[in-house]
Curated annotation (Swiss-Prot):
Pathway: Cell wall biogenesis; peptidoglycan biosynthesis. It catalyses: 2 D-alanine + ATP = D-alanyl-D-alanine + ADP + phosphate + H(+). This is D-alanine--D-alanine ligase. Its cofactor is Mg(2+); Mn(2+). One of its GO terms (molecular function) is ATP binding. ATP binds at residues 195-250. It is found in: Cytoplasm. The keyword Metal-binding applies. Its EC number is 6.3.2.4. Belongs to the D-alanine--D-alanine ligase family. It comes from Mycobacterium leprae (strain TN). It comes from the Bacteria. Mg(2+) 2 binds at E341, N343. The gene is ddl.
Length: 384
């Protein structure tokens, strides 16, 4: 008679600490950025307080229980990290609330039976950027499964992901915005009146994307068709925004376990060495592969400007009914701050602004992450 033995999985935690599943990767074109963020979070979660489980999602959507080694989720020789089916053990998270928090094996062989509960978790940290993660999809799954999770709920995640509806909610609250036009899938280009209203230059973006993927700066209308086609490689809905001449500022927002909300110091992004180039902007390569971005934290702005930015950041957070955390991006113009966008799950990579903003606000990285987890547990799940 063969006796079943669980395969050796040394990364599975034990003990009485809060068990956190860091979920990363995913089907969006921000897969690699999510992996980088997860590596940074895995490195900085306080292991005295938390047991940590790493769950990677492949680009095809397969969930894998992986080794929570942050070194495996780093850029190596300019190669971005990714989750593969060889990364660990295939699993699922059941939506049945009677099995809340269970990670269930889907694998066969090597002594492992499909349907076996690999481990159970107390809270999920969904470090997913872009569609199929940051847009309310995984938040809906976790609500069905009654598993607490870090970050915004279904509505705020969906609204924050879609630039059109973010802007509509901000406009309803009277927040300062730039001019824009939305091109839905059946609209090939702008009307003449829209071109006149926006004027050049404009930025053409996927409406539901991040990390500056798929974005083009258009300085002549002849460039518009190719810019729209490029954006539509990532999203059939495209947004065209009037360029704003101003400094790029960012501010972090953090919800505490008691429900109060705080804003961080203000930071500024400058693209090094290309300040005289009209076509330069803070794109994906600048953010993650090249050392071309300079981050001033805190930003060199007057106190009254910083206070206004922090106040607007909290207003933006509340305008979409956000929870947990967010980063709000601004342009500082001669007439004051203009909101660019809100990120309901900002980047946590080694170069990301969000943890840097809180570090200069006297909240170190482990404390920042612990606050997010504590807030998720205090909030729970369900209508609130």
């Amino acid at each position: 008679m063969n006796v079943y033995q669980r395969p050796l999985m040394p990364w599975l935690p034990s003990g009485g600490r809060v068990r956190v599943a860091v979920v990363f990767g995913g089907r969006s074109n921000e897969h690699a950025v999510s992996c980088l963020s997860a590596g940074s979070i895995l490195r900085n979660l306080d292991r005295q307080r938390f047991d940590v489980v790493a769950v990677g999602i492949t680009p095809e959507g397969t969930w894998m229980l992986t080794d929570p080694n942050p070194d495996a989720l780093a850029i190596a020789n300019r190669q971005l990290p990714a989750v593969s089916c060889e990364s660990g053990i295939e699993l699922t998270l059941p939506a049945d609330p009677r099995r809340s928090g269970q990670l269930v094996s889907l694998s066969h062989g090597a002594g492992l039976g499909a349907g076996e509960v690999l481990t159970s978790v107390d809270v999920v940290f969904p470090v997913l950027h872009g569609p199929y993660g940051e847009d309310g999809t995984i938040q809906g799954l976790l609500e069905l499964a009654r598993v607490p999770y870090v970050g915004a709920g279904v509505l705020a995640s969906a609204a924050g992901m879609d630039k059109e509806f973010t802007k509509k909610l901000f406009a309803a609250e009277g927040l300062p915005l730039s001019a824009y036009t939305v091109l839905r899938p059946l609209r090939p280009t702008l009307h003449r009146q829209e071109c006149e209203r926006l004027s050049l230059p404009v930025f053409v973006k996927p409406a539901r994307g991040g990390s500056s993927i798929g974005i083009s700066r258009v300085s002549s209308w002849g460039q518009l068709p190719s810019a729209i086609a490029y954006a539509r490689r990532h999203d059939p809905k495209v947004i065209v925004e009037a360029a704003v001449n101003g400094r790029e500022l960012e501010c972090g927002v953090l919800e505490m376990p008691d429900g109060t909300v705080a804003a961080s110091a203000v930071g500024e992004i400058r693209v090094a060495g290309v300040s005289g180039s009209e076509d330069s902007f803070y794109d994906f390569t600048t953010k993650y592969l090249d050392d071309a971005a300079e981050l001033d934290v805190p930003a060199k702005v007057d106190d009254d400007v910083a206070d206004e930015v922090r106040q607007l950041a909290i207003q933006a957070f509340r305008a979409i009914d956000c929870q947990g955390l967010a980063r709000v991006d601004f342009f500082l113009t001669d007439d004051g701050p203009v909101i660019n966008e809100i990120n309901t799950m900002p980047g946590f990579t080694m170069t990301s602004m969000y943890p840097k903003l809180w570090a200069v606000s006297s909240v170190d990285y482990p404390t920042l992450l612990a606050t997010m987890v504590d807030t998720a547990l205090a909030r729970g799940v369900g209508m609130r």
